[in-house]
């Protein structure tokens, strides 16, 4: 499938993504393979448009642990904002997939107080789902108690039919049984 830049003249090339989610033709992103450019300004790549987000998702997986740490340190204060961004949330999912326990704990602590709101958000829900899949069962159980109490205060029966929240609830159920 070919992803086109957004209507405002994307600064990124049109890139061809294969079904596995990675960039098919590495030449399509040759000018953006400068690691220093990516490491120095990851937010530019993440927030501009779909192509920028796809570029950083693909390249992040190829970086060294030190380079990944540099990017993480530049964006960690924006985790909440990026998790709800229509393009950047996909990178936050990749970040969680590629992270060690320390980074996952940081992301968890950044999002845990707003878990319910993120679970209802059409972009944030992907981040919460991936995060729940990475957390230890003990943390999931503690989080479930807080989440459940919050749900009961927010008309849980009505909100449980929300498609995004429902996906999060399914992960909770799988993880705590």
Model regions: which residues?
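Eukaryotic gene-expression regulator signature that favors modular helical reader/repeat domains
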Residues: 1-177
């Amino acid at each position: 499938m070919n992803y086109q830049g957004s209507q405002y003249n994307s600064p990124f090339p049109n890139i061809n993504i294969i079904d596995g989610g990675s960039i098919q033709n590495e030449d399509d992103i040759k000018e953006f393979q400068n690691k220093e450019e990516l490491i120095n300004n990851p937010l530019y790549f993440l927030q501009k448009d779909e192509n920028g987000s796809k570029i950083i998702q693909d390249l992040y997986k190829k970086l060294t642990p030190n380079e990944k740490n540099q990017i993480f340190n530049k964006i960690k204060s924006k985790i909440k904002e990026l998790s709800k961004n229509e393009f950047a949330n996909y990178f936050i999912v990749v970040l969680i997939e590629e992270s060690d326990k320390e980074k996952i704990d940081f992301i968890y602590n950044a999002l845990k107080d707003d878990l319910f709101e993120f679970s209802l958000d059409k972009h944030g829900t992907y981040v919460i789902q991936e995060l729940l899949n990475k957390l230890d069962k003990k943390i999931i159980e503690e989080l479930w108690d807080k989440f459940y109490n919050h749900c009961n205060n927010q008309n849980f029966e009505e909100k449980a039919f929300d498609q995004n929240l429902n996906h999060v609830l399914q992960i909770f159920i799988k993880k705590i049984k």
